[in-house]
């Protein structure tokens, strides 16, 4: 399964918001900064006005960067791995430790899939459980303190020499660990019907043949053995009765599987129960000789075979006999360390890998024992099938096996992971996963995405965590890449509560960058509250991350400078907000949640400037609804020290933007009411209830518009001088404020004129014109700069024409 880009659908139900009160900025032209020390500033008045407005709700949906919604479903194992890691990270190798808990969880999943007969997941969980078992075994040795070496003497038994060999050779000890791991992870042996009487049918055939007939076999000839010696069939080159021959094949298949799985006692018991007592005795000859009288540190009795190498040579000779069953040859081959005879019956990667390791470990041990206890005259050379074998060569041979099933299994990502763990080259497979992730991130499909599927990302991430907890070196660039991909995966599946645990394992260079980009994806109120608690639990600086998140999204979205005024198209408040702007607003709320008031003021103003400069009135209004006025409450209690000047300036600028959004919302509501066709139904007259209700609403909307527009104009809305800002103080900011002012003051003038005109209040239209033309506020400059002076003059002309017909007009007589 190839890995996809983990973009997510971000659905967020916004908080209630408050709009500003109808009371306008009557006193806004007063120098706000100059009145702070009097204890009651215009800022406080603006906040109080804001809190009187009715509450409203709005649902917002944001989607991923490509405007696509991608959902990833993950099982409960992701939560369980998270919990296990959190609880057991200080206890790695014990029976109640981290790695064993991983292993047990995988075993539980494996058993469940067996019941559900889910073949794909049966294989995955089986391989994963084996992987954690392998890590537990290998790393408990690699990270353990080296104990004192076992020392032998001239008369030590071969069993002691074997222990000495492993105690002095860490590489050999690791190979033996892997061999035991492969042995313990074998498949269950096939079942077999137990017969207590060996060669029963052949025995009866021989009896009947000697008596001159047989009721058990209809075809007695000289091809059947004539006696029941254990090696009669081989020695005489004759066969058994077909039924006994079939049973022998089943027996050797089961016997080999029992030896393969390390069930040596069960193998001996099988021999005894099937009448193969001689075979049980001969198999015990494979045990190394141990003498408790010489090896006084050992408590066991004398046991084993002094001439084990002779038995193994006999076994090797039997592997060359093609007349005997392949599983019998494989059993003898496994006993002596021969490779080819065992490989002949191996059809799985695990079995073939065990065969290689069996041959390699036996050969290396034999070479050591021969060097420690040479018997020049009688010593037989070791079986050399394992000569030159190393783990790397073994896995390379398996990858290029002539058996298709073995070669296919060798390419499985979890088996590749196991081979890298065994060869202590975990960094290489982590690097391969990183390369695949980079290909996906850059839009190039990797040749293989097998290492970055959700299950593999989970496994690799927790291996990285284990390595870091263990104090082992991990390439930071590679590990960061994989952990970040896993974080993206969890976020895609809405498992955001799991993410903070993994954030803390990122390197210092990217930790808060990743944390901040993750916070961008967390948009639900409950999830954000939970993130605050998790940040405290894992000692993460969520304030810093939230600020970085806002900076990232702002830099991403605000990529162009404001256009010239005459090229700007003002969007309606009701138009849908672009997803990228939604994301910016949603991210800005993190500063509110983390109570970073100063930064909230700064960035809210930056975002307002951007939106209003490019005509995104709908986006500006959306921002207005998501940053409530009570976010500024801390300002009302601030002292009047000079260092707070910039804070009050930011707050006053923000209140200007909020007042504009509120006023234009009033105007939009007024327009909707004024366009309603209340007289379409002839039954609706001026005396009707419907008309009266509509008229009342319209008059109220008109009053709100007049009040709010008038207050904004009289307050010299957003003029830099009201912020005590001069052109030389900050030329770019000064220019930006003037650009926005020149864009929206004409909207206020024309909108207010329209309301007066609809009310047939022509005197107010002309009074407004006088204010516009006044040199006090120089509002006419905004009309000139915006190129809308001619438009306004034409409106006045219409008002003049209509005023002539009024009772007080020129032609009223």
From Swiss-Prot:
Q: Which Gene3D superfamilies match?
A: 1.10.3450.20, 1.20.190.50
Question: What GO cellular component is one of the record's annotations?
Answer: nucleus
Q: Which GO terms describe its molecular function?
A: structural constituent of nuclear pore
Keyword terms, alphabetized: Cytoplasm, Membrane, mRNA transport, Nuclear pore complex, Nucleus, Protein transport, Translocation, Transport
* Chief site of localization: cytoplasm
Which biological process terms from the Gene Ontology are attached to this UniProt entry? mRNA export from nucleus; poly(A)+ mRNA export from nucleus; post-transcriptional tethering of RNA polymerase II gene DNA at nuclear periphery; protein import into nucleus; ribosomal subunit export from nucleus
Report whether 4Fe-4S shows up as a keyword of the record.
no
Protein transport as a keyword of this entry, yes or no, is yes
Annotated localization: Cytoplasm; Nucleus membrane; Nucleus, Nuclear pore complex
Q: What does this protein do?
A: Functions as a component of the nuclear pore complex (NPC). NPC components, collectively referred to as nucleoporins (NUPs), can play the role of both NPC structural components and of docking or interaction partners for transiently associated nuclear transport factors. Active directional transport is assured by both, a Phe-Gly (FG) repeat affinity gradient for these transport factors across the NPC and a transport cofactor concentration gradient across the nuclear envelope.
Tell me which family the UniProt entry assigns to this protein.
Belongs to the nucleoporin Nup84/Nup107 family.
How the protein assembles, per its UniProt entry? Component of the npc107-120 complex which consists of nup85, nup107, nup120, nup131, nup132 and seh1. Interacts with nup120, nup131 and nup132.
What is this protein's name?
A: Nucleoporin nup107
């Amino acid at each position: 399964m190839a890995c996809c880009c983990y973009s997510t659908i971000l659905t967020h139900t916004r908080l209630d918001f408050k709009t500003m009160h109808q009371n306008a900025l009557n006193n806004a032209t007063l120098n706000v900064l100059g009145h702070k020390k009097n204890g009651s500033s215009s800022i406080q008045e603006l906040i109080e006005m804001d809190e009187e407005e009715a509450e409203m709700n709005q649902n917002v949906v944001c989607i991923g960067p490509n405007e696509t919604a991608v959902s990833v479903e993950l099982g409960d194992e992701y939560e369980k791995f998270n919990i296990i890691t959190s609880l057991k990270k200080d206890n790695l190798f014990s029976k109640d430790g981290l790695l064993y808990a991983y292993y047990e969880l995988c075993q539980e999943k494996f058993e469940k899939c067996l019941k559900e007969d889910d073949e794909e997941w049966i294989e995955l969980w089986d391989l994963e459980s084996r992987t954690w078992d392998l890590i537990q075994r290998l790393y408990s040795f690699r990270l353990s303190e080296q104990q004192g070496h076992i020392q032998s003497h001239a008369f030590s038994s071969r069993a002691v020499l074997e222990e000495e060999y492993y105690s002095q050779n860490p590489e050999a000890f690791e190979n033996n660990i892997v061999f035991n791991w492969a042995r313990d992870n074998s498949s269950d042996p096939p079942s077999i019907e137990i017969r207590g009487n060996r060669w029963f049918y052949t025995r009866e055939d021989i009896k009947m043949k000697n008596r001159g007939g047989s009721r058990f076999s209809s075809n007695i000839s000289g091809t059947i053995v004539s006696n029941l010696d254990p090696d009669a069939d081989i020695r005489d080159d004759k066969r058994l009765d077909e039924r006994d021959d079939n049973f022998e094949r089943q027996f050797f298949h089961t016997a080999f599987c029992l030896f393969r799985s390390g069930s040596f006692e069960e193998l001996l018991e099988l021999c005894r129960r099937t009448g193969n007592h001689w075979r049980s005795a001969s198999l015990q000859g494979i045990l190394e000789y141990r003498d408790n009288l010489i090896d006084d540190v050992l408590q066991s009795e004398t046991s084993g075979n002094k001439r084990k190498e002779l038995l193994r040579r006999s076994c090797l000779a039997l592997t060359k006999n093609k007349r005997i069953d392949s599983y019998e040859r494989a059993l003898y081959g496994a006993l002596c360390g021969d490779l080819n005879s065992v490989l002949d019956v191996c059809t799985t990667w695990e079995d073939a890998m065990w065969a290689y390791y069996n041959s390699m470990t036996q050969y290396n041990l034999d070479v050591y024992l021969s060097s420690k206890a040479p018997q020049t005259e009688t010593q037989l050379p070791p079986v050399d099938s394992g000569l030159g074998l190393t783990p790397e060569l073994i896995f390379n041979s398996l990858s290029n096996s002539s058996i298709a099933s073995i070669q296919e299994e060798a390419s499985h990502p979890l088996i590749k992971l196991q081979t890298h763990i065994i060869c202590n080259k975990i960094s290489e497979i982590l690097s391969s996963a990183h390369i695949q992730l980079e290909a996906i991130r850059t839009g190039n499909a990797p040749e293989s995405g097998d290492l970055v599927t959700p299950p593999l990302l989970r496994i690799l991430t927790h291996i990285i965590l284990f390595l870091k907890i263990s104090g082992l070196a991990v390439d930071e660039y590679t590990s960061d890449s994989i952990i970040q991909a896993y974080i993206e995966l969890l976020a895609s599946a809405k498992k955001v509560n799991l993410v903070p645990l993994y954030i803390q394992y990122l390197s210092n260079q990217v930790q808060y960058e990743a944390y901040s980009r993750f916070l961008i994806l967390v948009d639900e109120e409950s999830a954000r509250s939970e993130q605050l608690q998790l940040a405290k639990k894992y000692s993460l600086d969520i304030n810093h991350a939230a600020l970085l998140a806002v900076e990232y999204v702002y830099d991403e979205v605000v990529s162009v400078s404001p256009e010239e005024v005459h090229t700007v198209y003002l969007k309606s408040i009701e138009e849908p907000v672009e997803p990228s702007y939604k994301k910016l607003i949603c991210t800005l709320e993190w500063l509110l949640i983390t109570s970073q008031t100063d930064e909230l003021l700064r960035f809210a103003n930056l975002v307002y400037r951007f939106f209003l400069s490019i005509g995104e009135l709908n986006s500006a209004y959306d921002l207005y609804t998501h940053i409530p006025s009570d976010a500024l409450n801390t300002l009302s209690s601030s002292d009047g020290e000079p260092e707070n000047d910039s804070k009050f300036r930011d707050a006053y600028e923000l209140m200007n933007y909020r007042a504009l959004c509120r006023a234009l919302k009033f105007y939009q509501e007024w327009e909707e009411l004024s366009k309603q066709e209340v007289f379409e139904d002839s039954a609706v007259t001026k005396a009707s209830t419907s008309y009266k209700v509509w008229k009342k609403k319209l008059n109220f909307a008109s009053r709100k518009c007049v009040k709010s527009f008038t207050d904004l104009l009289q307050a010299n809305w957003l003029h830099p001088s009201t912020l005590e800002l001069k052109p030389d103080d900050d030329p770019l900011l000064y220019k930006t404020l003037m650009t926005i002012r020149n864009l929206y003051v004409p909207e206020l003038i024309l909108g207010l004129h329209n309301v007066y005109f609809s009310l047939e209040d022509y005197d107010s239209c002309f009074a407004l014109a006088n204010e516009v033309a006044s040199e006090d506020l120089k509002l006419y400059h905004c009309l000139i700069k915006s190129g809308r002076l001619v438009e306004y003059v034409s409106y006045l002309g219409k008002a003049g024409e209509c005023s002539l017909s009024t009772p007080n007009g020129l032609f009223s007589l």
